[in-house]
Amino acid sequence: MKTWVIKIGTSILRGTEETSTEEVIETLSRSFTSFLSKGNKIILVTSGAVGLGCQKLNIETRPNDLSTLQATAAVGQVNLMSLYDKVFNKLGHNIAQILITKADFNSRKSFNNASKTLKKLIDLNVIPIVNENDTVANEELKYGDNDTLSALVALAINANKLILLTDIENLYSKDPRNNNDAQPIKEVHNSELKEIKDKNIKNSNNEWGTGGIATKLISAEIATKGGVEVQLVDGTNKKNLIEIFNDNKIGTLFYPVEKPIRNKKSWLSHAIQTVGKITLDDGASFAIKRKGASLLAVGVKDVEGNFTINQAVKIVNTNDKEVAKGLVSISSDKLRSILNNKENNNSSIIVVHRDVLALS
């Protein structure tokens, strides 16, 4: 049995002058049927609520202000789920709506609850349809058109594959719209991904979505580090949908790492939001990266932000490069007090224990 997470972008769902959103969803859902009939499972991560809300309210351009974005998302989400329910009902499939924000994944307990719920739904042969809760979110609306969310969902359920359906054929060496010499990239191994992601790739934003190629590369990096294969595919081509479910190599394949980060450390690395930053000296940086040591107060050079026990912090070296994330054992006030030599006897206190420290 295979479990796949399929992310459907706004550029796919919005359709064209000739094809409605309902027709797009019907084409997509029919392509899933053969895959599901073999006992496989899918979870959909969908965008499109804002776009559909704008259509319903006759708003011609995507709003810029947050309150209007959230209002259109509220209207559009009802329409979006109604379309999914109508189409999947015809094919004899039950669906479930799951609305998530990044804050929901910030708690380990909430992350585990979401994981258990998603797994139970697919055990019951229900197709979960996940979207960011845009009506209450703020940063989420600007963050990545559900690309990052789809990667986190894939990690939460230990998916075999994450499929990113978009409106481009593959990843390219350059933006193909502006560069005639742009070359398609068919395969990306994890050792290459960071360099590709960090290059100055022009974002392929369009008016109705909030994502682009950069967010898809971030999503691919998160998923592959957690052991999930990622496939970037042009979802506007109906033939591609057949090829995907025959497990053919189309679009761009991102291969997972050989030794993935799983469970709690995967959550620490990718799902949790940090509230502060700790700068290490060279010795401490070496100890946690090469020796798997806990972070001690003696190795801390600087502290930024305010945090309390069990909150997450970013841990950087003297060049401000992130080396890890972790949950602190002491507050920022206590740590600053130690650094200011007010408590010399506590310089060996554990700031972040190795069990709750995830290397970047």
Curated annotation (Swiss-Prot):
HAMAP family: ProB. It is found in: Cytoplasm. SUPFAM superfamilies: Carbamate kinase-like, PUA domain-like. Pathway: Amino-acid biosynthesis; L-proline biosynthesis; L-glutamate 5-semialdehyde from L-glutamate: step 1/2. InterPro entries: AceGlu_kinase-like_sf, Asp/Glu/Uridylate_kinase, G5K_ProB, Glu/AcGlu_kinase, Glu_5kinase, Glu_5kinase/COase_Synthase, Glutamate_5-kinase_CS, PUA. It comes from Prochlorococcus marinus (strain MIT 9215). ATP binds at residues 7, 166-167, 210-216. It is an enzyme of class 2 (transferase). Transmembrane segments: none annotated. The gene is proB. SMART domains: PUA. Catalyzes the transfer of a phosphate group to glutamate to form L-glutamate 5-phosphate. GO terms for molecular function: ATP binding; glutamate 5-kinase activity; RNA binding. NCBIfam families: proB (TIGR01027). Residues 275-356 form the PUA domain. Substrate binds at residues 47, 134, 146. Its EC number is 2.7.2.11. The lineage of its organism: Bacteria, Bacillati, Cyanobacteriota, Cyanophyceae, Synechococcales. This is Glutamate 5-kinase. One of its GO terms (biological process) is L-proline biosynthetic process.
